[in-house]
């Protein structure tokens, strides 16, 4: 075989290489990949879901399978496309109407558009939502909401103690808090007037 033919064969063979992650440089956003037979690449970029005005970050895992796509068959110029199911991670679901992220700690993000249900599950920890100065914080043992104004519409059921730390408590515009007063207070069995 001539040198030219051998070079062409090598370049064609190097266009798309099945491989797995051998190293990750998080600060630089680069990975090294290997073919499992002794070859390891130079540091190359990996593909993300988005890298424009909207950007996505998920670092490939060590051992994660994917393919190295190399222009002109030069692996040093390649980019790694992660996400082939294999030894490092099996498929997390098998339903066509579900998008799922499952994480090593047991957490998951699941959207089932057939059931119209979005589920966020953490084994423990914190979920924080921040919009401007308003926030909601969910932990293992408490839910805390903070905003200039909170409006609840609909029937409300509270099972447990209620503690109110505020300057006023009103019902239908009438003060029923700790500073409310009653008129018509007379000794004896008579009833008081409504709160003022």
Predicted regions and their residues:
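Exposed beta-strand/loop interface patches that mediate assembly or binding
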Residues: 1-117, 195-196
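Intrinsic-disorder/coil detector with helix-boundary
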Residues: 2-4, 19, 130-196
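Short, glycine-/Ser/Thr-/acidic-enriched flexible segments
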Residues: 73, 116, 125, 134, ...
């Amino acid at each position: 075989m001539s040198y030219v033919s051998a070079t062409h064969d090598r370049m064609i063979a190097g266009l798309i290489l099945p491989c797995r992650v051998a190293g990750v440089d998080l600060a630089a956003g680069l990975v090294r990949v290997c073919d499992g037979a002794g070859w390891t690449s130079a540091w190359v970029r990996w593909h993300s879901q988005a890298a424009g005005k909207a950007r996505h970050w998920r670092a490939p895992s060590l051992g994660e399978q994917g393919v190295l796509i190399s222009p002109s068959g030069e692996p040093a110029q390649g980019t790694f496309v992660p996400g082939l199911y294999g030894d490092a991670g099996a498929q997390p679901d098998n339903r066509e109407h579900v998008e799922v992220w499952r994480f090593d700690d047991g957490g998951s993000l699941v959207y089932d558009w057939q059931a119209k249900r979005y589920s966020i599950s953490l084994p423990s920890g914190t979920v924080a939502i921040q919009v401007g100065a308003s926030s909601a914080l969910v932990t293992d043992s408490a839910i805390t909401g903070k905003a200039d104004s909170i409006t609840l519409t609909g029937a409300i059921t509270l099972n447990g103690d209620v503690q109110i730390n505020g300057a006023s408590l009103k019902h239908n515009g009438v003060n029923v808090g700790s500073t409310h007063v009653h008129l018509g207070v007379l000794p004896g069995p008579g009833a008081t007037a409504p709160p003022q």
